[in-house]
Amino acid sequence: TDDIFSDSYPTWNKNGEEIAFVSDRGSYVDGEFFGRIEEHNYSQTDIYIVNINNAKIKRVTNTPDNESYPIWANSERTLFYTSDYNGVYNLYKHKLVETSKNDSALNEAYAITNVLTGLQQPTISKDDNSIIFAGYSGVGWDLYSLNNPLDLESKKIEPTNFINTRDDEDLTVADIRDTDKIERIDLNTNSKYSKW
């Protein structure tokens, strides 16, 4: 790519002719961008594929959510990636089907995980039998595996409370240096919460 948009997390498909990647380009997949970048929503990302033989870019996802970390399956034309659809990054499966126009259809992707704290950086085994990813648990990040990801059924995930109420809440930034606004925790109570 050679434009003003941010492109990241490139990953080759098995035959080496396509690269899936993450971008904030929105609908700008060909031609020049004549708008003003400060008026472009560069905070939202989708998954795209570029064919290295003709440099054509195809948009795979088109959601208001942030998709990231695409990885190709090796035995079929399927992408896995993370999405924060419900406010937490879960793993999604997206089978790509060729249409008569030789474009990847925007098939509906579906979640194959429903985690509480999010996951990142998935990678798939050569035989497609396992996906390893980083997930947050307790006080840090750990590695987890998911067996037979191509065979997993859709998981129903509900939007988190943050997503359900994000338009209702005051999300203004507070200056925490103003000590009058800081809630103090009494460290001498028998609270069920950690002092850390």
Predicted regions and their residues:
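Strand-loop-strand
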Residues: 107-110, 114-117, 125, 130
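Short coil/turn segments that connect the beta-strands within blades of beta-propeller domains
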Residues: 15-17, 75-77, 127-129
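Short, solvent-exposed loop/turn segments that connect beta-strands within catalytic domains
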Residues: 77, 98-106
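A flexible loop/linker signature enriched in serine peptidases of the S9 family
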Residues: 1-8, 21-48, 59-68, 81-92, ...
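Outer-membrane beta-barrel initiation region
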Residues: 150-196
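NTP/phosphate- and nucleic-acid-binding module
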Residues: 51
